[in-house]
């Protein structure tokens, strides 16, 4: 059920590269729910959607619309439900992608490396949770394991959108193997909490992001100053790379806002139930 890269060779051959990475999970990003009340206002568009779905089915092309009728919302997605469930199993596995501070950019199953033979030459990679070990990609920049805030933010959004369609009908284990069932809205919030926790003080008063910087952990003048690192250690959430990457790591503010709105909704619902 996972999405993998494929190398297209000059001689027409295709070589699968079975690396479980954030690239395979990014198929979740292209997700949109078309609400029935909106579709009722544009009947011609609805009619063309039906033609589009039938055309792709007839020509055996990958479906973007899995279910289509006149009475429900419509989900546009590259990932059908059966495949989504398999992707979520990997996404929420602590031995694969799920870390205390978010989703790793490469599965931890590649700790011992992955390689592929191409015309007698071997190419490979392995899980690297923090700084990269190669200078080929700009020195300390590394997409082979660490948590990157902007990509995680897109996952949080995608999961919330999928929840708006599936609601409580789709339940997954959180984390995988725990027996604890959650809907995708709860998964979205859990992921948001993990990302926010990177900057929060733990029980010892330490912020994971500042793990290697005693001055920012203990000094009274600096301990409450938060640095927005480029990316974060895939196992312990330590800040890595440029420490001034506010441009994308600052999106954590949107996640704090999301969690606050969720809490307000819960409180209002509880008050309403008490009145009833």
Regions found by a protein language model. Give the residues of each.
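Acidic, mature catalytic/reactive cores of soluble proteins
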Residues: 1-276
